[in-house]
Amino acid sequence: GELIEVAGSEAGKTIDQADPEVSDAVDFCHHYANASLQLTDEAYMAGARFVPVDVTVVASPWNFPVAIPVGGVAAALAAGSAVILKPAPPAKRCAAELVAAFHEAGVPRDLVVLAPLDDGDVSRYLVTHEGVDRVVLTGSYDTARLFRSWKPDMHLLGETSGKNAIIVT
């Protein structure tokens, strides 16, 4: 209920829009929790060696303020990474609720932290910091290019400017 209310007040979502987004977030948590078990399954890994990164920044959007950040945070945690959640400025309250929910679920406070920063120099410092191993961005193509211009060798996973185009022949 709280996440639905915050998604409504911050992102303008109706209950009909926010409720399935919260359900998607729960599904992401279940999916990545199960996926994490595969990383220790020798038969599944087939001789591959998994090496987690230390710190992942999840830069999430304003328009899906629950499901997308939860998916990024849960995936990074499942892969053994600490997470800094940097929400879009219009979605800071939603992000704070999400981080609190991860903590209530038992994730240690130092493994998921909130960086409710405005866009600009401080955000640049965060995503280019030498202690950050990976950035997960859901946002515009221009933002991805900006991040890459700040740090060309950045390990950037981006979902950018999608229009869900389909060609039917």
Which ranges hold each PLM region?
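N-terminal alpha-helical segment of soluble enzymes
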Residues: 1-15
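An alpha-helix initiation/capping motif
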Residues: 16-27, 120
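Rossmann-like NAD(P) dinucleotide-binding subdomain of oxidoreductase/dehydrogenase enzymes
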Residues: 8, 12, 29, 34-169
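A generic alpha-helix surface/boundary motif
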Residues: 2-5, 23, 96
